[in-house]
């Protein structure tokens, strides 16, 4: 059996990025944290932490951290099932998802499920698949169904995609010509503009104008409000700007544009994630 205090010290160092910050969280001295981590490394016979700023895990350390996260989640669920009083168990989990799924689905679901101590990793769907296969995240959202051993998959309600632009841009570009205007995206091959364009103009829609790359989907929305281009984004993200009039919907009343998403998580953690699965309205795929 591994020492719980040493495991807690090791995890705290990587969560906070330093031995000093870990000591403050744990309420012990920095020397005590260092000794516990060193003892754990000696017990296992390998280095777990790169002594950099911030501190980073070695390959073995990354695997150990995943083990700690999984074990903590299952321990918390066991104590809940047994109806016992938990001694302040703090389960930490990682979820990977594309930016549109984070903004359009995940954040609200996390709030409804009252999940705590989570980390969201923003990646495209293909990268989410890789992270799931390597076990570097506990769960993930992709835009296509997957079949991975040991991973449970669920289909999510389709997400409505809406296109908007500033009032000035809408005046300058008739609806039929909007595709020629600059579009704001997080990556050159972002699928959201194409999904929206196909729903509104058909599969053989005109070629897009220039793409302006932004750091996040939220920045795309802000950029659209500033007149930098038009944006296709989850409907929920655009409700506020549409209500204030800083953005105008393009092609309202036409066919609904939707994007499908799928929720995947490690099967052994399904019970621990039940509140989030419910909040996402997920159905077994």
Report each predicted region and the residues it spans.
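Short helix-boundary/capping micro-motifs
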Residues: 11-27
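A short LG(V/I)-centered, amphipathic sequence patch enriched
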Residues: 41-59
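Alpha-helical linker/hinge and terminal dimerization helices associated
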Residues: 43-44, 64-88
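Central regulatory/effector-binding core of bacterial HTH transcription factors
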Residues: 90-148
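Short beta-strand->loop
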Residues: 152-162, 244-258, 265
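Secondary-structure junction motif
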Residues: 180-204
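Hydrophobic hinge/microswitch elements
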Residues: 205-250, 254-257
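A late-sequence structural motif
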Residues: 252-285
């Amino acid at each position: 059996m591994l020492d719980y205090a040493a495991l807690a010290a090791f995890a705290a160092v990587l969560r906070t990025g330093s031995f000093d910050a870990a000591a403050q969280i744990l309420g012990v001295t920095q020397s005590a944290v260092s000794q516990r981590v060193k003892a754990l490394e000696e017990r296992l016979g390998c280095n777990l932490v790169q002594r950099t700023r911030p501190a980073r895990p070695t390959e073995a350390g990354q695997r150990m951290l995943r083990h700690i996260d999984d074990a903590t989640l299952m321990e918390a669920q066991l104590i809940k099932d047994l109806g016992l009083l938990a001694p302040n168990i703090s389960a930490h989990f990682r979820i990977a998802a594309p930016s549109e799924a984070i903004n359009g689905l995940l954040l609200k679901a996390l709030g409804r499920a009252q999940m705590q101590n989570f980390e969201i990793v923003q990646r495209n769907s293909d990268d989410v698949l890789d992270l799931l296969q390597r076990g570097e995240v506990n769960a993930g959202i992709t835009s296509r169904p997957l079949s991975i051993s040991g991973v449970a998959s669920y289909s999510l309600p389709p997400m409505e995609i809406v296109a908007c632009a500033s009032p000035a841009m809408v005046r300058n570009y008739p609806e039929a010509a909007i595709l020629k205007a600059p579009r704001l995206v997080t990556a050159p091959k972002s699928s959201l503009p194409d999904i929206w364009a196909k729903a509104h103009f058909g599969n053989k829609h005109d070629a897009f104008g220039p793409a302006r790359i932004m750091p996040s989907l939220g920045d795309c929305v802000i950029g659209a409000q500033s007149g930098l281009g038009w944006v296709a984004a989850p409907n929920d993200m655009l409700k506020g700007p549409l209500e204030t009039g800083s953005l105008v919907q393009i092609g309202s009343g036409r066919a609904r544009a939707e994007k499908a998403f799928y929720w995947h998580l490690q099967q052994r953690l399904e019970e621990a994630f039940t509140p989030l699965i419910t909040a996402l309205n997920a159905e077994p795929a």
